[in-house]
């Protein structure tokens, strides 16, 4: 690795990670500091060349130095962890019951960050027992295979009359977000983290009548990388089973 003469965030030999976002810096979202939703956003390995090459150049403002002692394996997982850090901060989860729909890597990390941010209780759901076992290994005690038991029934047993107040859609399928909308408490928030291959058909009447809020979550910003590194370094978020 080589660094330009003006670079101060790292030096040759340092272990680093970097955000893959390429942003314009000139559009309104960028000017507001919301460059994760840049009007001209490109992502390396998608709309721009990736990093599977011997040498490539990145701007220093995308670089985050890894702390001493953090393995490169964990360093490679900071990117998805930052997705979890960002999504879990899109609404206030402290003291609230939470359901995370989808127990893949991102859903697992969203659930872990919700716990870290003070959620009262977190239930994670999926159709895969393997993914749910991984969630339990990561410290998410309450899991549900929705092919074996309905969410409504399980949530009632787990949360009682209090219900749950925050849902995270991390599966990317219509049945998932519809289930959240139909079982969450009125006046609650649903954060959409997944990328849907097909737009779901949702009841706007139900949304309005129950005064639900659908909140988008797009990738991350620099501070989310820093939060992810901090929580992983302190053992608050467990990457080892992943």
Language-model segments: residues:
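Glycine-rich beta-strand-centered segment in the early N-terminal region that forms part
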Residues: 1-28, 67-69
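N-terminal Rossmann-like NAD(P) cofactor-binding module of classical short-chain dehydrogenase/reductase
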Residues: 17, 165-168
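NAD(P)H dinucleotide-binding glycine-rich loop of Rossmann-like/cofactor-binding domains
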Residues: 24-101
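Mid-domain Rossmann-like dinucleotide-binding core that forms the NAD(H)/NADP(H) cofactor-binding site
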Residues: 70-149, 153
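C-terminal substrate-binding/catalytic core of Rossmann-like NAD(P)-dependent dehydrogenases/reductases
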Residues: 153-161, 197-242
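Helix-to-beta-strand junctions that scaffold the AdoMet/dcAdoMet cofactor pocket
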Residues: 184-185
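Glycine-centered, small-residue-biased loops immediately flanking beta-strands
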Residues: 188-189
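Acidic carboxylate diad motif detector
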Residues: 193-194
